[in-house]
Each structure stands twice: as structure tokens, then as C-alpha cells.
Amino acid sequence: MAAASSPREENVYLAKLAEQAERYEEMVEFMEKVVAAADGGEELTIEERNLLSVAYKNVIGARRASWRIISSIEQKEESRGNEGHVSTIRDYRSKIESELSSICDGILKVLDSKLIGSASGGDSKVFYLKMKGDYYRYLAEFKTGDERKLAAENTLSAYKAAQDIANAELAPTHPIRLGLALNFSVFYYEILNSPDRACNLAKQAFDEAIAELDTLGEDSYKDSTLIMQLLRDNLTLWTSDMQDDTAEEVKEAPKPDDQ
């Protein structure tokens, strides 16, 4: 007879079910229970940390997409002078923004209070610090004034801390190091409006990975080459943007389903 599964294993399984059912809010709840069960400084497994990341990425991703759509409609209505509509849209946008803030605050609290401190390996430290940078970046996307400035500073600090560890401990072809470079470069481009820095960071990461491509193991080949392609796509987009200001969708690191 099979041994009864622990509450932690049960919640991991429920999180996988929720993912299959695309019930991502519940997936977040199950993974937060997994984090709570990993007490006494115990680390999450690679599978668990990836499930946590996927859960939050989907929950935040839906609202980020909503926010972009509503902001685009707001700009159109403003240009038409429809003040009544603009006022309604702003109220609705602020509702989405409060949801975004709540989600970001939730995962940032978990990262700071539990996950970053318990991480021992270089890959897990970089994974969680990158995640911290990502969620501060999502705050910087819609915050204004001093709140935006603070979110951007916190993003930069987390990404830099992750970069220092990645450069020292992870191979240039490691998918987590590449994903960090991708998202860090997006931050420079979109939040700090520094296309030169963005391009330099992305190009350096791509070139360093290309130079060591023959050392890439079969298990991470797919993940690493996918992120390298996204780095190259962004470089192509950004260099053409700097010439003709054409706005297209910037690529970020994919959800870590297979890492």
C-alpha cells in the first residue's frame, strides 16, 4: 500500500491540477501553502519553485494584459476628447492597478520573508532575486511619481544582486542566467528608457552563451536556446526602434515550465 502523501505533497499535486484547469488564483493559494509547509529554512524543490513562479506569472500576466488594453483605450478616448469616458476608464484602470499591487506585494513578501533567505545554491538565489526584480518591475510599469521611482530602484537592486551571483556561479548558457539577462535588459529598455544599456546587456549575454553553446547539456538545451532567441528578437526590435521608433511587443523570459 502506498504511503499517505504529506500535506506539502498534496498541495503540490493540487497546484498541478489547478494549472491544468487554468485556475491560477487557486494554484497560487496551493503553492503558498507549500511555502508555509517548508518551515525551518527548508528549501523548495526545483519543481515547487517553478510551480510557484508559473502560478504567479499567470495571475499577474492576466492583469498586466488587462491594464495595457485599458490604458490603450484611455489614450484613444483622451485624444477624441471624450472626458466622460476617460473618467470612467481611469476608475476602472485603478481597480486593475490595486489588484496588480496586491499580487506583487503578496509574492514580494513571500520572497523576502522566506524564499531568498533559505536559498543555498546559486541557481535558487538567482531564481528568487530575479523573481523579486520582476515583480518590482511590474509595479514600476503602472506606478507614477515617487512610487514608480522606488519600484524601479528596488528592481535594479534585485536584478544587480542576481546578476552578481549569476556571473560568479552560473554558466553563460544556464537558462536562469539567460532569463535574468533578458528581463534585466527589458527593464533598462522599458522602465529606465535606456536602449543602449538594454542592447549592450542583451548582446553580451547572447554572445557569451553562443561562445559556450557546445558545453550545453541536453536537459537545458531547449530552455537556453529559446531564451537566446528571445534575446536576439529583442535586439533586432530595439535596434530598429532606435532608427524608426516602431513599437512592437518586447519579449520577456518564459514561464519556467521545463527548467
From Swiss-Prot:
Identify the SUPFAM superfamilies for this entry.
14-3-3 protein
InterPro entries the record matches: 14-3-3 (IPR000308), 14-3-3_CS (IPR023409), 14-3-3_dom_sf (IPR036815), 14-3-3_domain (IPR023410)
The cross-references to Pfam families, in alphabetical order and at most eight, read: 14-3-3 (PF00244)
- What's the family? Belongs to the 14-3-3 family.
Query: Per its record, how is this protein called by name?
Result: 14-3-3-like protein
What species does this protein belong to? Helianthus annuus (Common sunflower)
Q: What is the lineage of its organism?
A: Eukaryota, Viridiplantae, Streptophyta, Embryophyta, Tracheophyta
